């Protein structure tokens, strides 16, 4: 059985609807947007042709999810009529925030769309256009870990920030757990490019939840209909209650 608070409700638009999930990099590349240079451009592999093999399939080196085929937000917007024909009323986007990996579960910047996908303004327009056509946008909330190549950890030094990896005096240092600083730390299922966060660290909870400056309200003000919470089973109840 499911236990929930009596006042808990779900959005009316979500009930009985059809959800369509999109992995942006491989959905559609529109010529109306040209991918901008990323902070970690040097480690990304841009593909000019949509049907090219991933670089790791050519080199046979250890796979890294850094092949980019440059699917973008404009490509999604151009398929509005396709979604309407399918009676879709909700689109769930895999992570869109800046990340060095094509899956974008290794967040580098929680407040900006990845420059290969588009801009924050592009995303705001997408949300508004789709909502006006009866389709809500849900974002993937990746809050159990960040990327090591990020503003917050900055292991590769691609950002101007003092990340947790760079100094114990970093404002982000309390977010992470180091066994031996700086190279041995807790990471999501042992993937060292995904350092896990201390989910009940007050500064981190404020970063995510603060009504004025937090990650959640930032994207909600851009027009999303809701969130899908990644690995929700790995969060303490106190964090979930605060969302």
Give the positions of each predicted feature.
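Short, charged, solvent-exposed linker or helix-capping segments at domain edges/interfaces
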Residues: 11, 15-16, 32-35
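Conserved, well-ordered alpha-helix/loop/beta-strand core segments that scaffold catalytic motifs
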Residues: 225-228, 234
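Conserved beta-strand positions in the central sheet of alpha/beta enzyme cores
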Residues: 92, 138, 228-230
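Substrate-binding/active-site clefts of carbohydrate-active enzymes
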Residues: 24-89, 96-222, 243
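Extended acidic/polar, glycine-enriched regions
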Residues: 1-12
């Amino acid at each position: 059985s499911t236990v929930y608070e009596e006042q808990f409700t779900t959005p009316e638009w979500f009930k009985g609807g059809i959800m369509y999930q999109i992995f942006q990099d491989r959905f559609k590349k529109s010529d109306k947007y040209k991918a901008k240079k990323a902070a970690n451009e040097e480690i990304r592999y841009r593909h000019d042709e949509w049907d090219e093999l991933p670089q790791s399939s050519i080199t046979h080196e250890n796979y890294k999810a850094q092949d980019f085929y440059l699917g973008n937000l404009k490509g999604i917007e151009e398929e509005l009529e396709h979604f309407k024909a399918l009676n879709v009323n909700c689109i769930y986007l895999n992570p869109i925030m800046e990340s060095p990996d094509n899956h974008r579960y290794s967040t580098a910047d929680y407040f900006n769309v990845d420059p290969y996908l588009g801009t924050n303004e592009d995303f705001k327009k997408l949300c508004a256009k789709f909502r006006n056509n009866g389709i809500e946008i849900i974002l993937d909330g990746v809050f159990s870990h960040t990327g090591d190549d990020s503003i917050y950890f900055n292991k590769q030094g691609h950002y101007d920030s003092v990340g947790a990896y760079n100094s114990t005096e970093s404002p982000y240092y309390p977010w992470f757990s180091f066994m031996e600083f700086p190279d041995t730390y807790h990471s999501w299922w042992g993937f060292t490019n995904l350092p896990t966060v201390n989910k009940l660290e007050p500064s981190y909870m404020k970063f995510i939840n603060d009504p004025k400056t937090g990650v959640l309200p930032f994207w909600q003000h851009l027009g999303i209909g809701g969130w899908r919470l990644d690995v929700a089973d790995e969060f303490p109840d106190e964090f979930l209650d605060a969302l």
